[in-house]
From Swiss-Prot:
Organism of this sequence: Haemophilus influenzae (strain 86-028NP)
GO biological process, one term: L-histidine biosynthetic process
Protein name in UniProt: Histidinol-phosphate aminotransferase 2
The protein's annotated pathway: Amino-acid biosynthesis; L-histidine biosynthesis; L-histidine from 5-phospho-alpha-D-ribose 1-diphosphate: step 7/9
Positions carrying N6-(pyridoxal phosphate)lysine: 226
Gene name as annotated: hisC2
Catalytic activity, EC: 2.6.1.9
Reaction(s) the record says it catalyses: L-histidinol phosphate + 2-oxoglutarate = 3-(imidazol-4-yl)-2-oxopropyl phosphate + L-glutamate
Cofactors demanded by this protein: pyridoxal 5'-phosphate
Pfam family of the protein (one): Aminotran_1_2
Length: 366
């Protein structure tokens, strides 16, 4: 029996998601230690102390199911961003939410629009539900919003826009986003995926929550895996109008967020000092990456995230492999249609130093 023959039609064309290589795997493969992982856009400062304390206090309660509604976390999000708890949907990471949007609002034969070089989950979930993918060619590595509008049809149900975009780091301004939303029919859901918004400067950050008052078809998706440092716990949230949130919560799995994730999220969302430290390190170290690339005549895509994507003008796989042998893990992105590029997460100064040294050795810089 070949069970692929009885699988859902959309699933047959899928391949498993390939995550960044774990440190432990590389240690087993080549037998070295002191490995630096700059592959998955994780928080280099480690797990925040505020979250550790909150989790410790929660340990004796783990025989009980978590709060299925996430009351305390919703209250925290609502207070922080000036929204109402009934606008919030919680997810097991924002990946969970990105899939939830598609399962709630699209089905076989519907169209879902996203950009070339977009986050891999968008095409994965589109294929999984056997919807029609409309991938819009990128414009200067970023979103061609006019191309999105041109692609709209009566079958369009959902649009995904990451801002900043992963893996390219491109960024849309508030005005660009609002001009776009004003032209999208209200029966088309627009998902603004803001997984990396905390790394943008406050003066240029999009005030996306204010747009919810004007555009009822907007969903804002965020994660606590990046700036907040909770990647291993899997927690994210979406904010939308209450009717959309109600529909999402009908489809959302019960107890999709565990007790430790809910508790840690409340603690770290109130830890402004930690988030500012993370963002400041990212700003300083991003400048060092840009300087390194310019000094060594390496092309890169200017990024507003916590990563930078370098164009090596040649297949990057051998460079990636050579960096592994030097104890540095970065992210190959040939799967995104960018075989000449590597994406590097911004780490701590000493981690970035190791990358600069390793890449200089691999490329034989003076």
């Amino acid at each position: 029996m070949q069970y692929i023959n009885i699988a859902n039609r959309g699933v047959k064309s899928l391949s498993p998601y390939q995550a960044g290589k774990p440190i432990e795997e590389l240690e087993r493969e080549i037998g070295i230690s002191n490995i630096v992982k700059l592959a998955s856009n994780e928080n280099p400062f480690g797990f925040p102390e505020s979250a550790k304390k909150a989790i410790f206090e929660q340990l004796d309660k783990l025989t009980r199911y978590p709060d299925a509604n996430g009351f305390e976390l919703k209250q925290t999000i609502a207070k922080k961003f000036g929204v109402q708890p009934n606008q919030i949907t919680l997810g097991n990471g924002s990946n969970d939410l990105l899939e939830l949007f598609a399962h709630t609002f699209a089905t076989e034969g519907d169209e879902i629009i996203y950009s070339q070089y977009a986050f891999i989950v968008y095409p994965l979930v589109t294929k999984a539900i056997n919807a029609i993918a409309k991938e819009i060619p990128a414009k200067n590595w970023g979103h061609d919003l006019q191309g999105f509008l041109t692609a709209l049809s009566d079958k369009t149900k959902l649009i995904y826009i990451a801002n900043p975009n992963n893996p390219t780091g491109n960024f849309l301004t508030s005005q660009e986003i609002e001009d776009f939303l004003a032209k999208v029919p209200e029966n088309v859901i627009v998902v603004l995926d803001e997984a990396y918004t905390e790394f943008t400067r406050s003066e240029e950050r999009v005030d996306s929550f204010s747009l919810l008052k004007k555009y009822s078809n907007l969903i804002i998706s965020r994660t606590l895996s990046k700036a907040y440092g909770l990647a291993g716990l899997r927690i994210g949230y979406a904010v939308s109008n209450p009717e959309i949130a109600d529909l999402l919560n009908r489809v959302r799995q019960p107890f999709n967020c565990n007790s430790l994730a809910l508790t840690a999220a409340v603690a770290v969302m109130n830890d402004d000092e930690f988030i500012e430290k993370v963002a400041e390190n990212n700003r300083i170290e991003m400048r060092r990456y840009e300087d390194f690339c310019q000094k060594n005549q390496l092309d890169y895509i200017p990024s507003k995230g916590n990563f930078i994507t370098i164009d090596f003008k040649q297949p990057a796989a051998p460079i990636y492999d050579a960096l592994l042998r030097e104890g540095v893990i970065v992210r190959p992105i040939a799967g995104y249609g960018m075989p000449n590029h590597l994406r590097i997460s911004i780490g701590l100064p000493e981690e970035n130093d190791k990358f600069f040294t390793a890449l200089s050795k691999v490329l034989k810089f003076a």
